[in-house]
A protein has these predicted regions:
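Tubulin/FtsZ superfamily GTPase core signature
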Residues: 1-191
């Protein structure tokens, strides 16, 4: 966090070098180091420019400092959401004694694959506006913007995973019924 000013001053230059896309996925550690400062700065700049952003945060419970830094990073994303009145959509993974780094890496790759499929522009009846509304749910639902969790399910969604659902974006071969009714849903069909 010591280098916040330098990072903040250069965030726009970083984004100009790479340019925003239909979806901008930011992957970083949440447990300290430059990633826990750079990632929120990038997310802030992208949200300020009305871009689609998904953050993937990898936390750690290896030490008290890691836990504290992870919580601070998540609080930073929540503050960004509150200040900008825009959702911050985050997939969270945690390195721990129970979940090895290699297992977390596999999970992150699986989520990335699912997101690239979802945002590929290759799915019938699913356009960029549908996906914009999926991420910016506050524009099409009664929910207020906040830091929200992104969960990816391949196959059926377990009943215990539907309690706090705000929006659903699906890519399917054929019409699929959900066992619950979200406020907003968009569906793409594999071409």
């Amino acid at each position: 966090r010591d280098n916040y000013k330098a990072i903040s001053d250069n965030t726009r230059k970083i984004l100009q070098s790479f340019g925003p896309l239909d979806v901008n996925i930011i992957i970083s550690s949440g447990s300290g180091g430059s990633g826990s400062v750079i990632a929120p700065s990038l997310a802030t700049e992208l949200l300020d420019n009305d871009q689609n952003v998904i953050v993937i945060v990898i936390g750690s419970s290896d030490s008290r400092i890691d836990i504290d830094n992870t919580l601070k990073t998540l609080k930073s994303y929540d503050a960004i959401s509150q200040k900008r009145e825009r959702p911050v959509v985050a997939a969270y993974f945690q390195n721990s004694a129970e979940t090895s780094r290699s297992k977390v890496d596999e999970s992150v790759v699986s989520v990335l694959f699912s997101l690239t499929t979802l945002f590929s522009r290759e799915n019938r009846e699913l356009d960029t506006r549908d996906l914009y509304n999926f991420l910016n749910y506050h524009r099409v639902t009664s929910f207020k913007p906040k830091l929200v969790g992104l969960t990816v399910h391949i196959g059926d969604v377990p009943a215990d995973a539907t309690e706090d659902v705000i929006t659903v974006a699906s890519v399917v071969k054929d019409e699929v019924s959900l066992s619950f009714i979200p406020e907003y849903r968009c569906v793409g069909y594999i071409s």
